[in-house]
Structures are given as structure tokens and as C-alpha cells.
């Protein structure tokens, strides 16, 4: 371990030497740039653009370009980046992460690589965690870019597609991580090219990169639509049932936070719902509702996992920031189960139309960089997942903060009494205090105790984060006491008021350790910015969540040896601090493994999504007749149908192929079984294709306007692709939920998911081509299709395409008892739901 640590330190030192050398080159231009007039300095931007177009690389332009931004910052903002900030900027340009302490000027540091990369004209995205920071940084730093002749855009959720497109077309675009992700998904759902807003993803610089790429890595961005459902009553009934249970009726696994019915619980469920066997196949849906009701009532906690808004809506609380996540909903029916639990209106379930995780969203950028004050603990994950190094940048001034050893108390009550006593004593001295909590519930509890103790204070949590910046800015004033949920207010500096330095600076008090050391370090880092004095102190108890779930046997043995008879006994020990950090490392390792596994699953979806979206984009951007593509689909559909009967009896095969042709390609009288008898497979395929082509030409001939033909082709393909892709996403979700059980059969769930997912994707492609073929060949193409498509392409789709009645005869005995996903007996090779089952299923 010592050797590994020594190697890491030596590598960091070597990297800093290289950075220092480049930064000195930037310094060497300082006097030259200072001597230039404003006009001459501003003229550097078009000069750099021309040199870049003539073959100079951004690396070659870096020293001079950084020096230009540095001088411009001094003239426009009155701020001049330090030498260490130049080093941080170089790291950002190289697509890595400079670890810069709180207050070291990360926002100003970013101006240099952002300007340099904007010279290429390919676009730079500066990503922040909320719209307040995007607007603030774009407004402040945008003055420098605008002065230097670059355009700056702000991408906000409330903006129209036109305004978003304008923002993305700017040289530099400020946006939140969520909005960039949703815009990407929405761009891949539009029907017309002019409705797309983003350019190709070039360079992203992510502020608070650990929050976005680590803490929220598993969070999927989901675009979904409502599904008409009358199942709300089942949510309510399941909720009423689980509320009748005793603690013996269910089993909770605390470390994994999972829950299930015990044997007595199963008996009660069968009696309550009048069932013979709860786990019969026909009760699968009901067990899903019961499982969600159990989780909602006994795992998900009010004011910790979610809050109830004044509008009677369930809002998710971000476990890492303490903020409510507007617009987000728990998936798979859990959100509805919580709504039933809290007796608020139950909203309809939704169907996923598109989804992506932040991991895969940001890996699509040509170059990705990020800034944070606490990235070193997650270095392995940044390197393995995102191919980004974490390089600690020295502080401009030495850190003066004093970090005290943890204090451990036997109970939560004794711990909180000690916290309140400490806060009150410091308040009376005038020293500002920032109290960090992990949950909204804890911040409210401490607030009540401080009110009782007569200590005035501000509370910053998920319930009032809209004014967090103002509260945080005042947290360093003399006598200020601020309670903040976790890292709420991150991104806003706490500046010390007059006379506070003499009192010891800002004191940060942590009311418990977080699962991640990084989050604890972020809380500590709010104090002692830019060489200011400060203190940090963590208070722990044996009843804390981390201690209960992951406290080591060694900690317990040590505590048993100590006399903890008195409730207010306190233990202060470096060994204890080391043991707690050891527990945190184990949790971090578990969380990393989980995120890595999520990525392995999501990579299957990523590969398939990229294929679908690339093909979709080709269709949208096409300005030519898509006939060759459609003819290819017809040919492959015929091939699949004929090949599906290659081993069947010739007469049976001929009948099945004719049934397929009549249902998907031709009029009933256009093909007979006798015509196919005696023909080889290749000849049958050729015959069907020739006749199908004739029908295709007749259909297209109804559209005399070439533009109308292209519009019709596009809408047809996109409509089918989008419907099938939405179904496929749901199917993959179901597969992912079920494939874990295969581990019990000694099969690797991820390998099973990959192979099964690939097979399902192949089936989906076949279904897309079959649906396009059948709709194209059987559609009634109306007169209005000769007109140019209307402004709303989706409306046009409804006008242009109305499938003819396709003879299905589902009442025929041969179709009785066929399941949705079984092969259709007609011989098409398609699933029943996509063929003769389509009508009855609808």
C-alpha cells in the first residue's frame, strides 16, 4: 500500500511539473498582452480562428490564447487568474479533472479552456447542476467572452425550441446536465430536422463533476408519455393491505434496503385478496403492486427520501444535495405507491419513450472535462468509466482550517444535545457556524432544538432551496448560524464578514458521516477558503445510519471496553476516525461496483440506442427519395417470412407464405398457393418481391409531388420506429428486472442480458421492417398527401396514413390460445402481436 501511495504522489508531482512548465509559457505572454490596446486584444480572437483553420492545433494556440483571456478578465472583471488557476485550466483543456479547493476560483479558471476550445467553432458546453448557477456564470463570465467576440447562450428548461437552438448555436452554451440530456433525447424523437436543437456534442466542461458523473451516474433521464390506466384502485388496495401488516409479516434487509413478505404475510395476502396462491402466474401484476406498497410504507421515508409539496405532490429528495428533484418520479410504479401511502392524488403511470443515463450521455462528447474540489477519492471511477484523470492543483495560499477528530456519542439524543451546546457557545462568541445534515428530517429537528435554546438561525433544505444562494452568502457573517441539508448551496462561496477571522473563521459542524468521504470533504471545504481560518467538527452516534449498517466489529469491541453508562459520554479517538473512514471506503467500493454494473447493463441499451438514433437521423436529414431503403425493407421482410418455413412441408409452407403475402403485401386475389408449388425458395422470394414492387410503385404514384413522397416516406418510417423503440425499451426494462434470477442457475446475468437483449433487438428490427412494409403496402393514401406536409408532422402522419382493413380472422380456431409473443401461425415469422394478433390485441 505504501508503495502504491508513493507512486501516486510521484505521478502527481511529475504532472504538476509539466503543468507548471506550460503555465510559465502563458506567464511569458503577460507583458505583451498588457501592452496591447483593447482593439488589438479583441482582434486576437479572429486571428486564432484563422490560424486554427490554417492547421495550428489548439495545443499550439494554448499559451497565447490563455494569456489573452487572462488579460481580458483583468480588464473586464478586474480579476487576474493566478498561476495555479492557469495550471487548472490546462488540465481542463486536456480533458481531465483539476481538483481545486473551495474558493480557489474554479469559475474563473474555466474561462481559459472554454475560450480556447470555442475557437474551433464546434461549440463548448459549460454544464452546471442548476439553472441559478448556469445563469450566474453565463452572465458574469459571458462578459469576458462577449468582449473577446464570442457568442454566449444560456439553455434553460423554459425556453422554446427556437430559443434553445439559438443557445446551442452559440460558441459557448451554459446549461444544466439534465437539460442537455433531455434535449438530446427530444432531438431524437422529432419528425423534422428543423425541430432539432443541438449540434454534434464537442466539448463539455462539467462544474461539480463528481456530483453529476458519480452521485447522479445511475439516474436515468427519461422522456415518457402517459398510459391510460384504471389501476389506481389496485395501488390503493395494496396500500390498505400492507398497512394491516405487523412487523412479523415482512422481512427487511437493512444494508440493501429491500423488503418482502414473510410466510405469515403471504398467508394474510391470500386471505385479503381471496387467492389460492399469491405467486400463481395470473397474480404477477398484483405481487408487483404489493411489493411497491411494502417499499413505499416501510423503506421510503417521508422528509428523507421524498417530501409532500403544498400542491399535494410527491417530490423526490436528492440524497446527495438535499434538493427536491422537480419533474422526477420514482419508476416502476413506486411513485404511485407512495402517493397511495400519503393519500395524495395518484397520477397515471407513464410509458418510457426515450432514456439515457448521465454516464452514457457525457461519454458521447468528443472531449469531456470537469471541475471539483473533491475528486481524488473517486479517481479510479473517473479513469475507468470516463477516461479522465484527477490532478490535485496546489492552493494559492496554504489551508488554515483545523479539522478536529470525530466525537462519538452513545445515542442520537446525546449527540444532538452536544451539537446544540457547541453551536450555542460559538454563537454567543459571534463565530459563524454552518451545520451540515444528511436529511431534511435532521435539519428540522436541529432547528427546533436551536429555537428552544434561543439561537436564531437560517434553515436551508429541500423545502426552501430557491433562496439557498442568499442564505449561503450570509453564512460567513458574524453570529450567523446556518443549517444546510448535505451540500445544498454548493457552488456559492461563503465569504467571511468583518471581524470573523479573529474569532477563528467559519466553523463547520457535521451531524453525521455520509456514506461517501467525498461528501464529508465537501462539507469541510466550505470553511477555510483561500487561506481563511476555519474549523470542522463531526458529531457521530452509535445510532447513526452509517454506524448501524456498516459499523465494524472492531469499533463495537472497542466501545464495549469503554464505560458508556452515562448517556452523555463522548469518545474522541483517531482510531475511531480511521475505522469510520474504513467503513466509508467499503461503502464507496460497493457503490462503485453497483454503478459499474449499471453501466454494463446500460451499455447494451447504449449500443442499440446509437444504432436507432443514427438511422433515425439519416431519415430526418434525407432530402431524397427513400425508395431504396423501403424496397430493402420489403425484400428483407419477404426473406424472413420465406426462411421461417424452410423446413416445413412444402404444401404447408406455401399456404403459410400466401397467408403472409395477403396480410402484408398484396391483395387477396394477387397470389395463390398453386403459383408457389414447385418453386424453389429463391424463386418464391423473387416472385413475391416483383409483385410487391408493383404495389409499391402504385402506392407512391398516388403522390405526384416529390416533396410529398419524401414527407410520406419519412413519417411512415419514423412513426413505426418510434412505436417499436418505445415497446423495446419497456421490454428491456422487464428483461433487466428478471434476468437477475438467472444467477441462481449459475448463469452470468449481464451475459444473459447482453445475449437476450441482442436477440430482442434483432426481433425489433424485423418488426419495424414488417410494420413499415405492411403499412406502406396496405395504406390508403389520400388526395391531401399531394400537398406539402403541414407544420406539425405528427398531424400529417395521421392524415396521410390510415391502414386498410387487413383480413385477420382472429376467431379462426388456428388463432385461439396464441400468446402475444408467440410466432404467428400464418407463417410470417413475426410475433403474433405484430401480425394476425394486432387487431384483437388492439
Curated annotation (Swiss-Prot):
The keyword Membrane applies. Zn(2+) binds at residues 824, 826, 835-836. ATP binds at residues 85, 103-107, 493. CDD domains: DEXDc_SecA (cd17928), SF2_C_secA (cd18803). One of its GO terms (molecular function) is metal ion binding. One of its GO terms (biological process) is protein import. Its main location: membrane. Gene3D superfamilies: Helical scaffold and wing domains of SecA (1.10.3060.10), P-loop containing nucleotide triphosphate hydrolases (3.40.50.300), SecA, preprotein cross-linking domain (3.90.1440.10). It comes from the Bacteria. It is found in: Cell membrane; Cytoplasm. Its EC number is 7.4.2.8. It is a peripheral membrane protein. Pfam families: P-loop_SecA, SEC-C, SecA_DEAD, SecA_PP_bind, SecA_SW. It is an enzyme of class 7 (translocase). May bind 1 zinc ion per subunit. It catalyses: ATP + H2O + cellular proteinSide 1 = ADP + phosphate + cellular proteinSide 2. Keywords: ATP-binding, Cell membrane, Cytoplasm, Membrane, Metal-binding, Nucleotide-binding, Protein transport, Translocase, Translocation, Transport, Zinc. Belongs to the SecA family. Part of the Sec protein translocase complex. Interacts with the SecYEG preprotein conducting channel. Has a central role in coupling the hydrolysis of ATP to the transfer of proteins into and across the cell membrane, serving as an ATP-driven molecular motor driving the stepwise translocation of polypeptide chains across the membrane. HAMAP family: SecA (MF_01382). Monomer and homodimer. Part of the essential Sec protein translocation apparatus which comprises SecA, SecYEG and auxiliary proteins SecDF. Other proteins may also be involved. This is Protein translocase subunit SecA 1. It comes from Streptococcus agalactiae serotype V (strain ATCC BAA-611 / 2603 V/R). The lineage of its organism: Bacteria, Bacillati, Bacillota, Bacilli, Lactobacillales.
Amino acid at each position: 500500500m505504501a508503495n502504491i501511495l508513493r507512486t501516486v504522489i510521484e505521478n502527481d508531482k511529475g504532472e504538476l511539473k509539466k503543468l507548471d512548465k506550460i503555465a510559465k509559457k502563458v506567464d511569458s505572454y503577460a507583458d505583451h498582452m498588457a501592452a496591447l490596446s483593447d482593439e488589438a486584444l479583441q482582434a486576437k480572437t479572429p486571428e486564432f480562428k484563422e490560424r486554427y483553420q490554417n492547421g495550428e492545433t489548439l495545443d499550439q494556440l494554448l499559451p497565447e490564447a490563455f494569456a489573452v483571456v487572462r488579460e481580458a478578465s483583468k480588464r473586464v472583471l478586474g480579476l487576474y487568474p493566478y498561476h495555479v488557476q492557469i495550471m487548472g485550466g490546462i488540465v481542463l483543456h486536456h480533458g481531465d479533472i483539476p481538483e481545486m479547493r473551495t474558493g480557489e476560483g474554479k469559475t474563473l479558471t474555466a474561462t481559459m479552456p472554454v475560450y480556447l476550445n470555442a475557437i474551433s467553432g464546434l461549440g463548448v458546453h459549460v454544464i452546471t447542476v442548476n439553472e441559478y448557477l448556469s445563469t450566474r456564470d453565463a452572465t458574469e463570465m459571458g462578459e469576458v467572452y462577449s468582449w473577446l467576440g464570442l457568442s454566449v447562450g444560456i439553455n434553460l428548461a423554459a425556453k422554446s425550441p427556437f430559443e434553445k437552438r439559438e443557445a446551442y448555436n452559440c460558441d459557448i452554451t451554459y446549461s444544466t446536465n439534465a437539460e442537455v440530456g433531455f434535449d438530446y433525447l427530444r432531438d431524437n424523437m422529432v419528425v423534422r430536422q428543423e425541430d432539432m436543437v443541438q449540434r454534434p456534442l464537442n466539448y463539455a466542461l462539467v462544474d461539480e463533476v463528481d456530483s453529476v458523473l458519480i452521485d447522479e451516474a445511475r439516474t436515468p433521464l427519461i422522456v415518457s408519455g402517459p398510459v391510460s390506466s384504471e389501476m389506481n384502485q389496485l395501488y390503493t388496495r395494496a396500500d390498505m393491505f400492507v398497512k394491516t401488516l405487523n412487523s412479523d409479516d415482512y422481512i427487511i434487509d437493512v444494508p440493501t434496503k429491500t423488503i418482502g413478505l414473510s410466510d405469515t404475510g403471504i398467508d394474510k395476502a391470500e386471505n385479503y385478496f381471496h387467492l389460492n396462491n399469491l405467486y400463481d402466474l395470473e397474480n404477477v401484476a398484483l405481487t408487483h403492486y404489493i411489493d411497491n406498497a411494502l417499499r413505499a410504507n416501510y423503506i421510503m421515508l417521508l422528509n428523507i427520501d421524498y417530501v409532500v409539496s403544498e400542491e399535494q405532490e410527491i417530490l423526490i429528495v436528492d440524497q446527495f444535495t438535499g434538493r427536491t428533484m422537480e419533474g422526477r418520479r420514482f419508476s416502476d410504479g413506486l411513485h404511485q405507491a407512495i402517493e397511495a401511502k400519503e393519500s395524495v392524488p395518484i397520477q397515471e403511470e407513464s410509458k418510457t419513450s426515450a432514456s439515457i443515463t448521465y454516464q452514457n450521455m457525457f461519454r458521447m462528447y468528443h472531449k469531456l472535462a470537469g471541475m471539483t474540489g473533491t475528486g481524488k477519492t473517486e479517481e479510479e471511477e473517473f479513469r475507468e468509466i470516463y477516461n479522465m484523470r484527477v490532478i490535485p492543483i496546489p492552493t494559492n495560499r496554504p489551508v488554515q482550517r483545523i479539522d478536529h477528530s470525530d466525537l462519538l456519542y452513545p445515542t442520537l439524543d446525546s449527540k444532538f444535545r452536544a451539537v446544540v451546546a457547541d453551536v450555542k457557545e460559538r454563537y454567543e462568541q459571534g463565530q459563524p457556524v454552518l451545520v451540515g445534515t444528511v436529511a431534511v428530517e435532521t435539519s428540522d429537528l436541529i432547528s427546533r432544538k436551536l429555537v428552544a435554546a434561543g439561537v436564531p438561525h437560517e434553515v436551508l433544505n429541500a423545502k426552501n432551496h430557491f433562496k439557498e444562494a442568499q442564505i449561503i452568502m450570509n453564512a460567513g457573517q458574524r453570529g450567523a448560524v446556518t443549517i444546510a441539508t448535505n451540500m445544498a448551496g454548493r457552488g456559492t462561496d461563503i465569504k467571511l464578514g468583518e471581524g470573523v477571522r479573529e474569532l477563528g473563521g467559519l466553523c463547520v459542524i457535521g451531524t453525521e458521516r455520509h456514506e461517501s468521504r467525498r461528501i464529508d470533504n465537501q462539507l469541510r471545504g466550505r470553511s477555510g477558503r483561500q487561506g481563511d481560518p476555519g474549523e470542522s467538527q463531526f458529531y457521530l452516534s452509535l445510532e447513526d445510519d452509517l454506524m448501524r449498517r456498516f459499523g465494524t466489529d472492531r469499533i463495537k469491541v472497542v466501545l464495549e471496553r469503554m464505560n458508556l453508562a452515562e448517556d452523555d459520554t463522548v469518545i474522541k479517538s483517531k482510531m475511531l476516525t480511521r475505522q469510520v473512514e474504513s467503513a466509508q471506503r467499503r461503502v464507496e467500493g460497493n457503490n462503485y461496483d453497483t454503478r459499474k454494473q449499471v453501466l454494463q447493463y446500460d451499455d447494451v441499451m447504449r449500443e442499440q440506442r446509437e444504432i436507432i438514433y443514427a438511422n433515425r437521423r439519416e431519415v430526418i436529414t434525407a432530402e431524397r427519395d427513400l425508395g431504396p431503403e423501403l424496397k430493402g425493407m420489403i425484400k428483407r421482410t419477404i426473406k424472413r417470412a420465406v426462411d421461417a418455413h424452410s423446413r416445413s412441408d412444402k404444401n404447408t409452407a406455401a399456404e403459410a407464405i400466401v397467408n403472409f403475402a395477403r396480410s402484408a403485401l398484396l391483395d387477396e386475389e394477387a397470389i395463390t398457393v398453386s403459383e408457389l408449388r414447385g418453386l424453389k425458395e429463391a424463386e418464391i422470394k423473387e416472385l413475391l418481391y416483383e409483385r410487391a414492387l408493383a404495389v409499391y410503385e402504385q402506392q407512391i404514384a398516388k403522390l405526384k409531388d416529390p416533396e410529398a413522397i419524401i414527407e410520406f416516406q419519412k413519417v411512415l418510417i419514423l412513426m413505426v420506429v418510434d412505436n417499436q423503440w418505445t415497446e423495446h425499451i419497456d421490454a428491456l426494462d422487464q428483461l433487466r428486472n428478471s434476468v437477475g434470477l438467472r444467477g441462481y442457475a449459475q448463469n452470468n446475468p449481464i451475459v444473459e442480458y447482453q445475449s437476450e437483449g441482442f436477440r430482442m433487438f434483432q426481433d425489433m428490427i424485423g418488426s419495424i421492417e414488417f410494420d413499415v412494409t405492411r403499412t406502406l403496402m396496405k395504406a390508403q393514401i389520400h388526395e391531401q398527401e399531394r400537398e406539402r406536409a403541414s407544420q406539425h408532422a405528427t398531424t400529417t402522419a395521421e392524415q396521410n396514413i390510415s391502414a386498410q382493413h387487413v383480413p385477420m380472422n382472429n376467431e379462426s380456431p388456428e388463432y385461439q390460445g396464441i400468446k402475444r409473443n408467440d410466432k404467428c401461425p400464418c407463417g410470417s415469422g413475426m410475433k403474433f402481436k405484430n401480425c394476425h394478433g394486432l387487431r384483437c390485441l388492439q
